[in-house]
Design a protein with these regions (language model features):
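Short coil/turn segments at secondary-structure boundaries
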Residues: 189-194
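Beta/alpha (TIM)-barrel catalytic core signal, keyed to glycine-rich beta->alpha loops juxtaposed to Asp/Glu
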Residues: 1-184, 197-204
Length: 204
């Protein structure tokens, strides 16, 4: 059964008072759920899918600023596509790699996403960075309270991702990138469905 946000927040408040957790957050939430929970126990951060290909949660940014809540961006590279290291010839083993069934990795998607890849290449050249670093820097420079959490399987990629923190984009540059992204017709992407209505809670 669905549990009211106030009830969840009360439990989190108890855990904080007991010293068992320091902060708490909500994954894939709605504004209403966030506000109701926050009134009972201040929410530290929410976690939602966010990348250059999935930007629908930007509508929540004013609310997050109002409440002082951070934004943890998962899948900030669209499951690796925005690293610009893959091509239409890339294949994944469906038995071991879930990207095999993701729409952004279909052959026709690479054709449709060429303008996006071109944008990433141009920005990477301008800033002497990689496409992954540009994708991460774009969101980190957009708001200081956005924290991307890209996944990786090797140390070299981890170091590359950390390097994104050294890239500085002005507010004007970020707005220009957003404006260009608005004009690009992109392929379908995994996780592009509406917000999940039943949030999950996370304690730490």
């Amino acid at each position: 059964p669905a549990i009211e946000p106030e009830a969840v927040a009360e439990v989190m408040a108890d855990l904080i008072r007991e010293g068992k957790i320091l902060h708490w957050g909500i994954s894939e939430t709605t504004e209403e759920y966030l506000r109701r929970a926050h009134r009972v126990c201040p929410v530290t951060a929410i976690q939602n899918r966010y990348s250059m290909m999935v930007r629908r949660h930007e509508t929540s940014f004013p609310v997050l600023e109002e409440l002082g809540v951070g934004f943890v961006a998962f899948s900030p590279l669209a499951n690796g596509l925005l690293s610009n290291r893959y091509t239409a010839e890339t294949t994944f083993d469906p038995a071991t790699d879930y990207r095999a069934s993701m729409p952004q990795y279909r052959r026709e998607s690479f054709v449709k996403n060429r303008p996006l890849f071109a944008l990433l290449e141009r920005l990477a050249d301008e800033h002497r960075a990689t496409a992954s670093q540009i994708s991460l820097a774009w969101m980190m420079n957009k708001r200081s309270w956005i924290v991307p959490i890209p996944g990786t399987r090797c140390l070299c990629r981890l170091k590359e991702n950390i390097g994104a923190t050294d890239i500085r984009l002005s507010a004007e540059e970020v707005r220009a990138i957003d404006a260009e992204l608005d004009t690009i017709e992109m392929s379908e992407v995994f996780g592009g469905s509406p917000i999940i209505e039943k949030p999950k809670t996370e304690g730490e």
